């Protein structure tokens, strides 16, 4: 009867919460499997529960349990035994909280608040006698980290696993390479010595291991892509090629009459037992592989490889292209292993011819340099040619004497030797040409031709050069002249300066004459008024002397003249003018005229 009474005393919301907790606990016990995201269903349900009711759910049931456990059956007062047991028994909620806090759970952002386990509380309420045994039961909450998902593995473990896988794959690749080397040694006939063969094959594992260690990630990825093809026994020429290829250097055969081993400058292709793998080794690796051989040098030589079969890729495959990490690595896969055909190549003789071409070119170049002696065309200082008869060569461009001697001196000598026998007796090789450049700024070269009898005169050289004028233009010589023309040109420059000086002197003289004439004219203008004054005075005297014959007429004329002379003087404008001297003369003449008039009147 105690349980119904207890249940009746509890408020209705608490009953609903307890019922929900009991159902959730039963469901959690039945279904405790991780979901697709790694979280269990119970953990999701616990997270979805409202947090507002958790304090009420955690405190009230404990109080109710404590009160119900302390009540005596059949009475409303607690007994002494129940009080003692209640004092000795620790609170259930706080003990659970201590257990959860003491565990190694890391709830991440929700570590400040612990979700209580409702199923344990419901079980303790149904059977209070089993409450002390609850701590020994395993918790239903999964031990997980909300900040980090449980399926996430540590980064160090992943790196360790990747390193182990890479090491295993490298070991497998080394074993395959060793097998391929053995097959190559069996299939390929080598005409060199055994020691040279061993030295040639020695650096191949180190080279392959270095290439595989440089790109572990690319090796793993590429090996997964080509796993099916590798199991079939065929290694396809693909992106796996840098790690699966066998870099090696073929020891060259001894050339007849030469004790020097020569190596091919580019990469050599070796067949790998019918496999479509091509290995290319740089020249530096080949040199390191052939250090122990006798009389090895760095010259390029022919590599007779007619006895070596060569794998030819199908026509559908693309040409290997150079990549940024692996030079000369093909980026495309062939159609399949069955499409590749390993046939003896007929281009090996062509390869031999290509390897012999550099030697032929060098020999031709050396042969072209040997026929003429470099001392036949020399460059001298300008002071050494000052007292000799030389020819001035006007060049199309400003070129140095030494550069012209190296590149065009041989042709100039050949042209001169072709023409010289027509004019002079002599053999080829007896002539010497001396060149000099007087100034770095001018496009001129001085040439002196010296034969068995000494320096050839300039007139003879000019006559000889006239026959090869067009050929001279081809080697950059525009025209030519002699020293006399050069001296005439210098005198012409001097005469130009003389004429300029003469012109300046003439202009100065003309200016001086003009200035003198101007001064003379000015002086003449100043002297003219004095001459006019003297002549006018004489005329007046002549008139005065002739007045006795006709005094009346003279008086009238004199009075008119006086009237005309006094009017401008009264106005005052003609006193300072050019006719002021007539007014002055009139004023001086007045007393005389009056005396004459008086005398005439008296008469």
Curated annotation (Swiss-Prot):
Polar residues bias (residue ranges): 240-266, 302-314, 339-349, 558-570
Acidic residues composition bias: residue spans: 156-187, 592-603
Source organism superkingdom: Eukaryota
Pfam families: CD34_antigen
Cellular component GO terms held in the UniProt record: plasma membrane
Localisation: Membrane
Glycosylation sites: 75, 101, 260, 394
Residues spanning the signal sequence: 1-28
Modified residue annotations for Phosphoserine: 569, 594
Residue intervals on the Extracellular side: 29-499
Transmembrane segments: 500-520
Residue ranges of the region described as Disordered: 53-92, 124-368, 558-603
List of residues that carry Sulfotyrosine: 93, 113
Keyword line: Cell adhesion, Disulfide bond, Glycoprotein, Membrane, Phosphoprotein, Proteoglycan, Sialic acid, Signal, Sulfation, Transmembrane, Transmembrane helix
InterPro entries registered for this protein in UniProt: CD34/Podocalyxin (IPR013836), PODXL2 (IPR042397)
Record field: compositional bias (Low complexity): 196-216
Membrane-topology annotation of the record: Single-pass type I membrane protein
UniProt PTM comment: Glycosylated; contains chondroitin sulfate. Displays sialylated O-linked oligosaccharides. Sulfation is necessary for interaction with SELL. Sialylated O-linked oligosaccharides are necessary for interaction with SELL, SELE and SELP.
Gene Ontology BP terms: leukocyte tethering or rolling
Subunit-structure text: Homodimer; disulfide-linked. Interacts with SELL, SELE and SELP.
Function (record text): Acts as a ligand for vascular selectins. Mediates rapid rolling of leukocytes over vascular surfaces through high affinity divalent cation-dependent interactions with E-, P- and L-selectins.
PANTHER family per record: PODOCALYXIN-LIKE PROTEIN 2
Similarity comment: Belongs to the podocalyxin family.
Name of the protein: Podocalyxin-like protein 2
Lineage: Eukaryota, Metazoa, Chordata, Craniata, Vertebrata
Gene: Podxl2
